From Swiss-Prot:
Gene Ontology BP annotations: response to absence of light
Protein name: Transcription factor MYB27
Domain HTH myb-type: 6-58, 59-113
Domain of life: Eukaryota
Subcellular location: Nucleus
Induction (free text): Accumulates in etiolated seedlings in dark conditions.
GO function term, MF aspect, one: sequence-specific DNA binding
Pfam families: Myb_DNA-binding
DNA-binding region per UniProt: 34-58, 86-109
Annotated gene: MYB27
GO CC list: nucleus
UniProt motif Nuclear localization signal: location: 31-38
Amino acid sequence: MDFKKEETLRRGPWLEEEDERLVKVISLLGERRWDSLAIVSGLKRSGKSCRLRWMNYLNPTLKRGPMSQEEERIIFQLHALWGNKWSKIARRLPGRTDNEIKNYWRTHYRKKQEAQNYGKLFEWRGNTGEELLHKYKETEITRTKTTSQEHGFVEVVSMESGKEANGGVGGRESFGVMKSPYENRISDWISEISTDQSEANLSEDHSSNSCSENNINIGTWWFQETRDFEEFSCSLWS
């Protein structure tokens, strides 16, 4: 019998006529015995449905509109103290229902907390990034020095010390020039080329001198032979 009665109860959205009838019954009998009120009102609704409809929508003492700053502060403090006990928190906020407070918390404060957590996370990442950048610069400086030492780079005196040593006139060493083994090999190679070229020039000069001497010797021999021939001819004619 009760099962059939429950099947005949109306469910779903409330109609305007149902709201008006429930308000009239509650104004006459008060907020009590919701199952009895549901039967007396003639509404095909359960007592729980009538109670929730009254408390969340039809009660004239309900506050409409957004939460005030004072209400936000109370919700924040009580939630930190009691957690998700929304009915207990609603008793401290007249005109606000537990369901309204719960929805407000989920849609506002949770987003605020997530935004704060994200802000802290980005701040932590930013600080870590600066620290990592600083460590990276230190590592690069150390690696550069190590590489210079491994390849035999020799650091010459700095510009300031070069100016002091040269009386304010800085040569090539005054500007901190670095010489590597590769540069030394290039210099040696250029020197070898210059030496070979000089030897080649000397060889050419020697060859030229030899040719000149040979030419002189040939000329002298030809002159002597011609002179002897002339003297011989004169002796024949005389």
